[in-house]
Amino acid sequence: LELVLDDRIVIKGIQTDRIGTNWKFISNKLLSNNSYKLRLMSEGEGIYKSWNLKTFPSPEAQVENVSIMSFTCAGGPEGFKIAGKEFFKPFRFRQKVFDEGLSMNPDFAISIGDHIYWDLRGQNAPQIGRKNKLIKFFLGSYIGLVYGSFNRSEKASSSKNEKVLKNIGNEQIASLYGTRFKSTPIFFIPDDHDYFENDDAEK
């Protein structure tokens, strides 16, 4: 993949996964406080409509005003209810919050974790429910079937573990955010659940 800026600056993509669905683009040719039109290309063909993105002012610049959009704990799968109890907000609810914030044209956004809710509790897959062993078994088996289970004897970057990680991240991050922030720089700050555990003490 290539990222083309203003039809003149070409940035070669760097593939970061095995099958070519994750890429990063790095360039030192951009000017500070400048707006660019971006196009994503593959073998000379555009694969997404062009969009605009503005770089930050230089570190030495005297900035008079800055608008920041910030939110926390947006992670989790699509929301659902069981016996009247809500587990996570629906995607459309969270996306409405995103859209409301973006409508104010912030200069950048900060997404503070948790971005992922998938506490392993020392296992290969989440143990849903803390008391009922039957619930743990059936829901844990279902989750392992749908998303896969981590293999702790392999590296985190192994083919199997990468696939499980992407199954989780694609649902809780990629499907949630989509391309909403393509013209707004966004920084992700991890919290405890993003390391697949909750740091709260529990018996």
How would you describe each model-predicted region?
Residues 1-203:
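Divalent metal-dependent phosphoesterase catalytic cores across multiple superfamilies
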